[in-house]
Amino acid sequence: MDLSRSIEVFNPEVLNDEVHIIGVGATGSFVLQTLIRFGVKKINIWDFDKYEAHNVNNQAITQSCCEKQKVAAQIELCKEINPEAEVIAHDQLVTPEDIEKMSGYVFLLVDSMKCRKELFEAIKKNE
């Protein structure tokens, strides 16, 4: 993938640590695809939900993604964007125990404020 136009803005080599995106819906799908376009080579994505038709207007997906698990659909889309990138799917609800096993960069982009608060507390504890 030719990164010559974006390398001055963002060098993917700075992300040597693991990258985790928790929630690949409205915000998470755009964050994921932006990182893939910027040349980040390995990203873990976490989501237990599937895309529905009403998601197409506010999430980085196409009609073909509807009724698919979010993580599976994003893997397909990311391969189209950058075939060299490795996207690792975790088709599950993330728990504080899962957070304890994570290292590196964590993008916490879940919808539920209760869940977000719970996971944020686990992230702070894990620092």
Model regions and ranges:
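Glycine-rich adenosine-cofactor-binding loop
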Residues: L15-V40, N44-E52
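Conserved SAM/SAH-binding loop
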Residues: H90-E97
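N-terminal charged helix/coil linker that caps or initiates catalytic domains
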Residues: M1-H20, A53
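Short amphipathic alpha-helical segments
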Residues: L32-T34, N57-N58, E118-E121
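Glycine-rich phosphate-binding loop and adjoining beta1-alpha1-beta2 segment
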Residues: V40-N82
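A short helix-to-beta-strand connector/capping loop
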Residues: N82-I88
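ADP-ribose/adenylate-binding Rossmann-like module
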Residues: Y105-E127
